[in-house]
Amino acid sequence: MTWFTPDVIDAIIAVVKAIVVLLAVVVCGALLSFVERRLLGWWQDRYGPNRVGPFGMFQIAADMLKMFFKEDWTPPFADKVIFTLAPVVAMSALLIAFAVIPITPTWGVADLNIGLLFFFAMAGLSVYAVLFAGWSSNNKFALLGSLRASAQTVSYEVFMGLALMGIVVQVGSFNMRDIVEYQAQNLWFIIPQFFGFCTFFIAGVAVTHRHPFDQPEAEQELADGYHIEYAGMKWGMFFVGEYIGIILISALLVTLFFGGWHGPFDILPSLAFFWFALKTAFFIMLFILLRASIPRPRYDQVMDFSWKFCLPLTLINLLVTAAIVLLNTPAGSVQ
């Protein structure tokens, strides 16, 4: 009797896929810190990292050495258990969310029928990590930063979910692969769901706390916000987690609005991973370009923009989409 039954083999393959995907995401997140500094230097007419290795290519190695060997100090006035748990929860929630992203027709960690709901569950979990970090630090700037972050995240996640309901109404499924295949047979959702794309992208920038929505970390006001007391690997987990969030939102934009692994007009379908990676890289560069070109607004302007502009626009988009779907549905087929 062998242990390698078909079920065991399937489980081993699933574990290997999960490890490969998660390691690739972590490595890409670490590399993005170097890529961002080089691109910002290029766009701002300066050099950027150029001291460690040829063209500064080994800067990431220097950053990692510093992160690994810097003292992992915990303030004596902090709640040590929650203080340590916060960065672990933050990074774990982002990594687990990648489980529902279909990279190619055959590569993906999990094919869940509730893929979109699973993503929002993990996105909501990351809010607790930020609150844990701010409260457990026992620092007024950290607490204010965490309160800003949680309020901003909750505000933008409201219409972030509604922005995708138009897609769900058209496809009739929360499954990511079903959404990709629907786009392969019809138009990419960037065309019929353009306003949903705009609001989801704005919400994605806000949820990842990226410029211009980096209010929770505003250096001029909050001295780096909720991770002011963190150092060493704990700070590194927050730092790399921010770039992992960028990759996650970019991959979701590609999957939900730009046909996933399909190329334009289904050109070269055998290059599924290439198309997915190329489109994801484009949105990652767009995240970085926003940081280089747009000033940071006031916090009240950020919140007003969410509730007074984005939410009504998302509701209108959902109502119009639902009306069109109902009008195009044959009589008697609506259940």
Curated annotation (Swiss-Prot):
The reaction(s) catalysed by this protein are: a quinone + NADH + 5 H(+)(in) = a quinol + NAD(+) + 4 H(+)(out)
Q: Give GO BP annotations, semicolon-separated.
A: aerobic respiration
* Topology in membrane: Multi-pass membrane protein
The protein's GO terms of the molecular function aspect are:
NADH dehydrogenase activity; oxidoreductase activity, acting on NAD(P)H, quinone or similar compound as acceptor; quinone binding
- Keyword Electron transport among record annotations: no
Keyword terms, alphabetized: Cell inner membrane, Cell membrane, Membrane, NAD, Quinone, Translocase, Transmembrane, Transmembrane helix, Ubiquinone
Against InterPro entries, the record matches this protein to: NADH_UbQ_OxRdtase_su1/FPO, NADH_UbQ_OxRdtase_su1_CS
Primary localization: membrane
Q: Is this entry keyworded Disulfide bond?
A: no
* Matching Pfam families: NADHdh
Compartments, as annotated in UniProt: Cell inner membrane
Give the E.C. number(s). 7.1.1.-
- Name the domain of life: Bacteria
* A GO term from the CC aspect: plasma membrane
Q: Which residues cross the membrane?
A: 12-32, 81-101, 114-134, 154-174, 187-207, 238-258, 270-290, 307-327
The protein's job, in short, is: NDH-1 shuttles electrons from NADH, via FMN and iron-sulfur (Fe-S) centers, to quinones in the respiratory chain. The immediate electron acceptor for the enzyme in this species is believed to be ubiquinone. Couples the redox reaction to proton translocation (for every two electrons transferred, four hydrogen ions are translocated across the cytoplasmic membrane), and thus conserves the redox energy in a proton gradient. This subunit may bind ubiquinone.
What does the annotation say about its assembly with partners? NDH-1 is composed of 13 different subunits. Subunits NuoA, H, J, K, L, M, N constitute the membrane sector of the complex.
Q: Which family does it belong to?
A: Belongs to the complex I subunit 1 family.
Its protein name is NADH-quinone oxidoreductase subunit H
* Protein's organism: Pseudomonas syringae pv. tomato (strain ATCC BAA-871 / DC3000)
- Recite the lineage of the species: Bacteria, Pseudomonadati, Pseudomonadota, Gammaproteobacteria, Pseudomonadales
Gene, per the UniProt record: nuoH
